[in-house]
């Protein structure tokens, strides 16, 4: 791999990382702040967020399950008293 290709891959990874942060922050904000959101809609939002993240980082399912799923689980439990157990992996 030449230096130009290496730099391109680094920039792509940085772009995906920024998108990941934005997506997680946006999802977290909506889950906390949209008082019209139902539990099922929230679960769907988490499921769609997971799909989007795994499309950017296909080999990171375990990381999602360890780092982000508990975060979303906590939010859903705080808001609705139920977690993401209705999610299909």
Model-predicted regions and their roles:
Residues 1-89:
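Surface-exposed peri-terminal alpha-helical interaction modules
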């Amino acid at each position: 791999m030449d230096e130009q290709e290496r730099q391109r891959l680094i920039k792509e990874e940085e772009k995906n990382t920024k998108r990941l942060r934005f997506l997680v922050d946006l999802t977290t904000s909506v889950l906390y702040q949209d008082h019209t959101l139902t539990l099922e809609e929230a679960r769907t939002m988490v499921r769609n967020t997971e799909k989007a993240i795994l499309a950017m980082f296909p080999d990171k399912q375990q990381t999602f399950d360890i780092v982000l799923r508990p975060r979303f689980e906590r939010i859903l439990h705080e808001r609705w008293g139920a977690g993401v157990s209705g999610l299909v992996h």
